[in-house]
Amino acid sequence: MAHYRKLGRVSAHRNLMLRNLVTSLLKNGRIETTDTRAKETRRLAEKMITLAKRGDLHARRQVLSFVTEETVVKNLFDEIAPKYQERNGGYTRIMKLGPRRGDAAEMVIIELV
């Protein structure tokens, strides 16, 4: 029983794509992507923020193993995580934009609340 979406890619490509999407979301605060990619990105980004809320060295190393930029990790632990300290989950919001012109894929904006 799979608990994730395959997104039409082999596992290494899918994992790196999702790592890049999560890094971009944490770096910029919002990104525009397809609906299914956003739902997978939300799942992983919320885990990273929850780890950052713990704030210990082990959590920092776990986040560093997933997020691709060290500056984003520093920003996550110093600025983003304290903002959500009293919130239990639900750190992201997905807003629908409508279909993409080329292939009618459902486009959304995913952003940090």
From Swiss-Prot:
Keyword terms: Ribonucleoprotein, Ribosomal protein
GO molecular function: structural constituent of ribosome
Coiled-coil annotated spans: none
Xref: InterPro entries: Ribosomal_bL17 (IPR000456), Ribosomal_bL17_CS (IPR047859), Ribosomal_bL17_sf (IPR036373)
GO biological process: translation
Cellular component GO terms, alphabetical: cytosolic large ribosomal subunit
Superkingdom per UniProt: Bacteria
Quaternary structure annotation from Swiss-Prot or TrEMBL: Part of the 50S ribosomal subunit. Contacts protein L32.
Family according to the record: Belongs to the bacterial ribosomal protein bL17 family.
Record's protein name: Large ribosomal subunit protein bL17
The species this protein was found in: Alkaliphilus oremlandii (strain OhILAs)
Lineage, highest ranks first: Bacteria, Bacillati, Bacillota, Clostridia, Peptostreptococcales
